[in-house]
Amino acid sequence: MKDLLKFLKQQSKTEEFNGIKIGLASPDLIRSWSFGEVKKPETINYRTFKPEREGLFCARIFGPVKDYECLCGKYKRLKHRGVICEKCGVEVTQTKVRRERMGHIDLASPVAHIWFLKSLPSRIGLMLDMTLRDIERVLYFESFVVIEPGMTSLERGQMLTEENYLDALEEYGDEFEAKMGAEAVLELLRAIELEKEIEMMREELPSINSETRRKKITKRLKLVEAFFQSGNKPEWMILKVLPVLPPDLRPLVPLDGGRFATSDLNDLYRRVINRNNRLKRLLDLAAPDIIVRNEKRMLQESVDALLDNGRRGRAITGSNKRPLKSLADMIKGKQGRFRQNLLGKRVDYSGRSVITVGPTLRLHQCGLPKKMALELFKPFIYGKLEGRGLATTIKAAKKMVEREVPEVWDVLDDVIREHPVMLNRAPTLHRLGIQAFEPVLIEGKAIQLHPLVCAAYNADFDGDQMAVHVPLTLEAQLEARSLMMSTNNILSPANGEPVITPSQDVVLGLYYTSRECVNGKGEGMVFESVDEVEKAYRTKFAAIHARVKVRITETNIDENGERSESRRIVDTTVGRALLSRILPKGLSYDLVNQNMGKKQISKLLNTCYRQLGLKDTVIFADQLMYAGFHYATVSGASVGINDMVIPDEKYTLVADAEAEVLEIQEQFQSGLVTAGERYNKVIDIWASANEKVSKAMMENLSSETVINREGVPEKQESFNSIYMMADSGARGSAAQIRQLAGMRGLMAKPDGSIIETPIVANFREGLNVSQYFISTHGARKGLADTALKTANSGYLTRRLVDVAQDLVVIEDDCGTFEGLTMKPLIEGGDVVEPLRERVLGRVVAIDVMYPGTEKVLAPRNTLLDEAWCDLLEEHSVDEMIVRSVISCDTDFGVCKACYGRDLARGHIINQGEAIGVVAAQSIGEPGTQLTMRTFHIGGAASRASAENNVQVKNAGTVKLHNAKHVTNSEGKLVIVSRSSEIAIIDELGREKERYKVPYGTILEKLEEASVAAGEIIANWDPHTHPIISEVAGSIKFVDMLDGVTMTRQTDELTGLSSIVVMEVGQRPTAGKEMRPAIRLVGADGNDLMIPGTEVPAQYFLPANAIVNQDDNAPINVGDALARIPQESSKTRDITGGLPRVADLFEARKPKEPAILAEYSGTISFGKETKGKRRLVITPADGSEAYEEMIPKWRNLNVFEGEKVERGEVIADGAEAAHDILRLRGIHKVANYIVNEVQDVYRLQGVKINDKHIEVIIRQMLRKCEITNAGDSQFLAGEQAEVSRVKIANRELEAQGKQPATFERELLGITKASLATESFISAASFQETTRVLTEAAVGGKSDKLRGLKENVIVGRLIPAGTGYSYHQKRNAAAAAGTTTEAAPAISASEAEQNLADLLNLAGSSD
C-alpha cells in the first residue's frame, strides 16, 4: 500500500519553474528527446488495429496502447510496471506516455527550417547577408553557391548557375568547392564565427554614413548578438533530424463503418518519411545527380509543408481539396492551441437555459430550475445522502437521484443553502458579465434573473440564454461570495456610478408616484405622519398626486456616526410621502420630494451608497424596485394613437419652409447661388423647420391647462403617457416622439449624405410610398452597421485587453512629483466636464493653494473624495496637478497613489488589482453602443442648422486664443488665422466659455471688451470660405485667362459678373501648369508686402473659387478677395464612433496630418519647387536652420518673419499623436488622446473615467528609442522597454557611469501588444509564427509577469487573490530558496482516502 502511495505521489509532483525559455534545438537535443527512430510511413495494421512496428504509431517507440499492458499481451497488470517485453519490445506503463514521448526521423539530407527562411525578415538570409531569393535558389536546387573559394577569383557565398559552375570547374578544377541545397547553406552557416562577426560590425558601424546601410548592419548585428548570447548556433536553423510529435497529439480514430479519421499531421509525416526513405535508397544506389537532386528538393518541400503548409508555394491539399493543417496552423489563430485550449477551456458543472424575469427575487438571488440544480449539484447530493445514511453506496445514491425520491429534494435544499452559483451571459464584455447569486429553487425550466442586474448583463427577456457555473471548492465559493456577489457589485468599474439603477417599468412607476397634479382629490390636507397619509390614500380620501402638507421624521447622521432625529412639515404629494417609507434612515426627505426620473433615482442610489454604505443601498434598491413595479401597474399608463398629439402649428411651419425653399430654388436658377450653396441652404431650412415643429409638439405634449381649486385655469405638466415615458427616462426620447407626432424630417442616404426632400409626414399620419422608400435607406444601413459594429467592437476590446493585461497595482507609492494638469473641459458655451468630475477619486501631486494666496488648501498625496471636491469647488480652484498612471514611476506595474480610487469600490485601490484588464473592459464594453457612422437616429439625419455666429451665455470679458486678425474699414476685427478660439472670462479670471471660430469671422467686440449675456460677438458665413485681404491696395490678376483657367458667369437679372476658377482637370493644356492668383499692388504699381514680413501679398486661388472683384479694382483691409463655396454637409468625413476610437488607440497617422513646427524660431521661405514650398525655421540661438518641404495646396497658418514655438501648428489638418509626443511632450499627447476618445463616448452619452484611457496610454508609451547609449549595453536607435532602460540607468548612475538617454515612443495597441517582453503573450495575440521565430532565435526567456502567460502555463494569475501567492514566490526566489509545491493533504489522509476508495470499488461491483 505504501509503495502505491509513493508511486502516486511521485506522479502528482509538480516541477517549479520561474520562466519559460525558447530556443533552437540542436540535432543532438532532438535525438535526446526521442525514444526511437520512425522508419516506416505505416500507421496501424488495418486488420488487428495494432500499431505497426517502427511506424508512426509504433508502441515500442511511443509506449503501450493500453494501460500497463504490452502489445503482444505477455505482461499485464500493475505488478509488471516498468518491465520491457522481450517479445514485442514495449515498456509496460501508462498509456498517457503516448502523449509525451517523441520520436525522430534521421534525414538523409539536411533541410532548411521554413520559419527561419521565409518568416520576414529571413533569419538565414540576414545571417549569411544574402538575399532571400538567392538562398531559395540554392535550397531548391536551381543554382550553386561557393563554399570554399580556395585560391580562385571566386568569392565565398557567390551564386553560380549550372553553366557558370561547369565553366569554373573547367577553369579551376577542384581548387574550389561549390554545392547546392541545404548542405551548402549548412556549411556556410557553420563557418560563421559569431564573435569575430560582432567585433567586425561594431568596428564598422561608426564609420558608416549611408542611413540604409547602417540600418541593415544594426539589424544584422542584433541578430548575430542574439545568437551569440543565447548560445544558439546558426547551423541549427537547418534541420538534420526531424522530431516526431507524440502519437496521441495527432490521433487516428476509428469511425463506425471501418473507416478512420486521422489528423492531417499524419499525412504530412508520411510524405516526409516516404521521400526520406526513397532518398536514402537513391543515395545507396549512387543514382544520377539529377534524380537525387529532385528527391532532395521534394524532401525539402515536404518538410516545409509539415512545419508550415502554404508558407511557400501552393499548400499541399488532402483528399477533400482542403489544405492540410500543419504544425504552425495547430498553434495559431482562434482555433489554434493558444486561444482554443490554453486561454479558454470548457468547464464542468455548468448548464445553460433561457432567462425570465424574477421580480420577486432579492438582489442576491436567482431562480434556478430544480432539474438543473439536481444535475449541477449531483456529487454534493450523493455525499449528503450517504452522510445521512439514506444511501449505503454511491451507486445507491445515484439510483435514488435518478428516481427522484422525495428525500432527494430535502437534501438538495440543504446542499444549495448558501452555496452561490455564477451566472454568465455571453458576450461577457466586462467583469459584470459574470456575477454570483444564491440559487432559489423554482419549478419550470427557465432561470429567473433579478431585473436590476439586467443592465450589467445587458440582458433582456426576448429569448436570451445564460450559463450557470458552480464553484466547487470552499475557496472558490468564498471568492464568489465576497468578490462576485451581485450585491457587492453595485458600482460600475467604468465610471463609479451605480450600475444597478432601475430602468423602464420601475422608473415609470416611481415617476408616476412622485408627480404632482393640480386640484387632485384631497389637495391641501395636512397630515401628522406618513402613516396617516397612507391611511388616507388607501381609503381613497386622497389621490396619489394630490399636493398635501406632511410632518415627517428624518434621521440625521453626523461625522461620528451619531444618529439624531428631527421633525418638520413639508409641502409634498401623497405619492412622495408613500415613497419616503422605503427611504433608508439617514437620507434626507428632499431626495424623494421631486419628480423621480431615471437620473434622480440614480443620484438617489449613489447618495445612499456614499452616505450609508453597501448593505442599506442593496435593501433600498430592492424596495425601490418592488415599489416601482407596484405603482407602474396601478398607474395604468398605456399608449394609444390619440396620445401622439400633432401640433396645429405644424402645417403652417411646413408651408413656410416650402416657400423658403422655392425662393432659394429661384435664386439658384438665376445664378445667384451655386448648387452646393443651394443644397446646404435647403437642408438648413428643413433642419430648422423640423426643430420648430418638434419644439411646438413637445410644448403641446408636455403641458395641459386645468382648473385649480380657486376655479382659475393653471398650467401643469401633462399626464400624457408617451410624454411621461420619455420625460422619466423609462423609454423613448424626444427624437422618437418627434417621428411619431411631429415630422420624420431629413433622411440620410447610406453614404451619409442627406436627401434634400424631407419626410413631412409622421408615423401617426402615415407615410406614402415615396416617403416609405426614402426611409428604408437609412434603416437598412442601420441594421447592416449593427452587425459590423459588434464584430469590430469585440476586436477592439481584444486588442485593448492584450496591451494592458499585465498592468497590476504592485506598490503603495512610487513617490513621483509628476502628474497631469487638470482643468475643467469647456466646449462652446458649456462646461462639458467640471473640474470636480475630472479629479474626483484622484491623488493630489503638488499642494493645491487657496487661489491667490500661499496657503495650502489640499496637501500633496490627498485622495480627493466628494467632500474634498466640494471644498475645491467652494474656493473656485480651476487648475491643479493630480497623480496619473502615465507618470507613475513603478517598474512593471503602477502604484496605488498614481491610480487613486477603485471606482467599483469607492475607496483607494488595493494592491493586486488588475487595472489593465478593467480599463480595457471599461473602454471596450460600450463599444457596441458607439455608432459606426456619424449620423443615425433610425436613419434620420441629425444635423443642426449650420452655426454662423457666437452668442455668449455668460457675461464676462473677451479673450482671443492664437488668433491673428486685421481691422477692416468699419473698425471691426476680421480673423485671418485658422485654429482660433474666443474665450469668455468671468471676474475671477475663470474661463466660462470657449468657441472655435473659422477664418474670415468678423468680431463685433475687441479683445478685453466686456460683454453681456446673450450678446452676439462674432459672425461668419457657414457656407463659403472667404479669402481675406490683409493690406489695402488694388488687385492684379495673375494667370487668370478667360476660358483657360477661369470662366465668367453673368447674372441675367442683375447684370453682375463673377469669375469662377476652373478645376485643373477641366482646363485646356495651356492652363494645366498655371496657378491663378490675386496680387495686391500699391498706387505706384509695386507689390505690396504682407504686414511685418518680406513676403509679397499674393493669394493663390483654389479650384471653384468665385471672384467678385475685377482686375485693378481697389480693395480695403479685411475685405473678401474671393470666396470658396464649402461643399455639402459631408465636407470633411469626420470619422465618428468606433473607428475613431480604434484610430486613436492604434496611433494611426491621419491622411493629411497637421504640420507642426519642429523647432522654435523665425519662419522664412526658401526656394520653391514645382509642387512644394520650402519652409525654413531659423532658431533664435543661431544654431543650424531647419528646412521642410510643404506641398503648395496646404493652407499655411504662418507668414514670413513670424516667430513660432516648437509644436505650433504650421499647416492645418488633423494632428498626429506621434508629432504631439515628439514636439510637445508626454502630458500633451495624453491629454489629446484622452479628450479625443472621450469626445466620441460623450456624444453617445457614455461615461468613462479618464483613468482607464490613461492606463491604455501608459501601455502605448512603454517603449522608447535610445538616442545615446552612454555606458549601457543598448545600441543607439534601438527600441527598448522604458522600465528596462530606467533600471539600467539607475545601476549605471550608482556606479558613476554615464546613463543612456532615450526618447519615448508611442506605439499603437496592436504593435505594443506584439512588442511586449513576454513572447507567450505576444504569440497568443497575433502573428504567432513571427513572434515565435524571433523569440527562438534570440533564445528569449519569458519571466511570466503578465496575466496571460500565467493562465497559459496553468498558474494562478499575479493579480487579485493570486497576487499574494506570487508575492510569496517572488520573495522566496529573492531569498534563493525554491518553494516546493506541497500536496494539499498529508500522506496519512491520502492513505485513508485511498483505502476507502479501494473498498468502495470492491464492494460495488
Swiss-Prot record:
- What are the GO BP annotations of this UniProt entry? DNA-templated transcription
Coiled-coil residue windows: none
Q: Which SMART domains match?
A: RPOLA_N
Signal peptide per UniProt: none
- Say which enzyme class the record assigns: transferase
Q: Which key words tag this protein in UniProt?
A: DNA-directed RNA polymerase, Magnesium, Metal-binding, Nucleotidyltransferase, Transcription, Transferase, Zinc
Q: Name one GO molecular function term.
A: DNA binding
Q: Name one GO cellular component term.
A: DNA-directed RNA polymerase complex
UniProt xrefs under HAMAP family: RNApol_bact_RpoC (MF_01322)
Q: Subunit structure, briefly?
A: The RNAP catalytic core consists of 2 alpha, 1 beta, 1 beta' and 1 omega subunit. When a sigma factor is associated with the core the holoenzyme is formed, which can initiate transcription.
Q: Which family does it belong to?
A: Belongs to the RNA polymerase beta' chain family.
The cross-references to NCBIfam families, in alphabetical order and at most eight, read: rpoC_TIGR
Q: What is this protein called?
A: DNA-directed RNA polymerase subunit beta'
Q: Which organism is it from?
A: Shewanella sediminis (strain HAW-EB3)
